[in-house]
Structures are given as C-alpha cells and as structure tokens.
C-alpha cells in the first residue's frame, strides 16, 4: 500500500558522480546540446542494486563497502574492464583504479552476489588481457554470477578523445570464440 510519501529521487540525497576519465566513456562521446541529465556521469553503488547500474568501485569508500556487506545490498554490478591493475588505471585514467579491485575480494568473502562487465577496447584489453581477466574472474564463482563482455561503443563525436578502433566482424568472431571456451 502507498504511504503517501514521494521522494524527488530514490536515493533521498545527491547522486555520486564518477571521478574517472575512462578512455571509452560514452558520455564524453555524446553530441552537445542534449538535456543536462544525459551528461551526468554516475558511479554510485546505491544505483547498482537499486537500478542495475554498473560501478567501477573507484568512488566507493570503505564505509560503503562495509554497508553493502552489513545489509547484504546485492547484487552489485561491477564494471571491471580488466583484472590487470596497471591496465585498469590506464583505462579509467585513475591511479586508484587497480586498488579498487581489492573491494571485490571483500564482497566475495562476505558472499555478496556480483555481476561483472568488461567494455572491450580493441588492442587494449582484448586478446591475452581478456583471457587473463576472465580467468581471474572465475575465482569469484559462485558469487560472481555473470560477466558481460561488450565491445566499446564509438560515436562520431570523439574529437580530442583517446584513439580507439572499432571491432571488425573478424575481430568479433575471434573474441566470441575465446569467450565461448569459458561459458558453461
């Protein structure tokens, strides 16, 4: 039954914005002149279990981690990109991005259900790097329930951004063949 109370947003306070400068950020690739809310980069763990958003863990404090564990707020959807800490720092343009992966260990040890995502960038986190990441992520089974591997989306509005190449049909076939080896 409706309590008759309405909140302006589901968080009841301010959304947390992203402090990364990812080389693949889709918001940086949007055309100018759209509504302001489309340009907001969220990285808020509360939106992960409430709305299914993916978070990088770089904006998450120890207090946030402990709260997720204490209240069993799950699933948490994590945008991994890679399990190579140095490469993750490069891809997210955040020197703390590699250390943020340690939070996954805390979630695993507490039995928190997780889902993962890897935004695949050609020549950066594909090939052997992707193989390594998937192998590392299997260590979090059964609490890491899924890992989505999605090719980077590229728009025509990339001037001044990190140079990324689109995947060709042949590239995609190779990636899929490698991923299929890991599927159960």
Functional labels for PLM-detected ranges:
Residues 2-143, 153-181:
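Conserved Radical SAM active-site core
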Residues 150:
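Positively charged, polyanion-binding regions of nucleic-acid-associated proteins
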């Amino acid at each position: 039954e409706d309590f008759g109370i309405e909140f302006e947003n589901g968080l009841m306070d301010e959304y947390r914005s992203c402090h990364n400068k990812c080389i693949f950020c889709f918001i940086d690739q949007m055309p100018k002149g759209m509504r302001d809310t489309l340009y907001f980069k969220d990285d808020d763990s509360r939106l992960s279990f409430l709305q299914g958003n993916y978070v990088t863990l770089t904006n998450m404090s120890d207090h946030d981690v402990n709260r997720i564990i204490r209240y069993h707020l799950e699933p948490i959807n994590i945008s991994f990109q890679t399990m190579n800490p140095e490469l993750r720092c490069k891809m997210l343009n955040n020197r703390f991005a590699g250390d943020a992966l340690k939070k996954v260990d805390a979630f695993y040890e507490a039995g928190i259900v997780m889902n993962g995502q890897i935004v695949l960038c050609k020549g950066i986190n594909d090939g052997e790097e992707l193989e390594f990441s998937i192998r590392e992520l299997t260590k979090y089974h059964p609490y890491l329930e899924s890992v989505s591997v999605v090719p980077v989306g590229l728009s025509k509005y990339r001037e001044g951004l990190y140079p990324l190449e689109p995947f060709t049909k042949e590239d995609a076939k190779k990636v899929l063949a490698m991923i299929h080896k890991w599927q159960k």
